[in-house]
Amino acid sequence: MAFIQFRQSWQFKQILTGDPDFNMSTTDKIAGLREILALDPKNSFARYGIAVELANRGEVEAAMAEFNQLLRGDPDYTAGYFMSAQTLSRAGRTAEAVDRLRAGISCAARTGNRHALSEMQGMLDELNR
């Protein structure tokens, strides 16, 4: 029943797919994603979305708290490593970004995600220059 109510109160598909024609403020996106988490606390995609939105708003500490919780609950969520490393790098926290990339590369190798591995290795090489 709660899911049906949720689907009526939010454009569920548009939130999750990032429909470009759907005009929703960042605050509304975060609220919608938090509503998804309230119904499904282990929803990695929703937690990742919150972290990315917070990072885009420049709320680095809040974003990192979400990324850290995401990766504790779902250590194979490869995108979480890459986006959190980017967030750390933009904040000037290069050593932490390097550590996160190394963990992400290990995850990508473990899960067979060659594309993510290549992306993270490229960023790591750039940071190590």
Task: Name each region found by the language model.
Residues L39, R72-G73, C107-T111:
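Structural marker of alpha-solenoid helical repeat scaffolds
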Residues E35-I36, Q69-L70, G104:
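Canonical positions in the second alpha-helix
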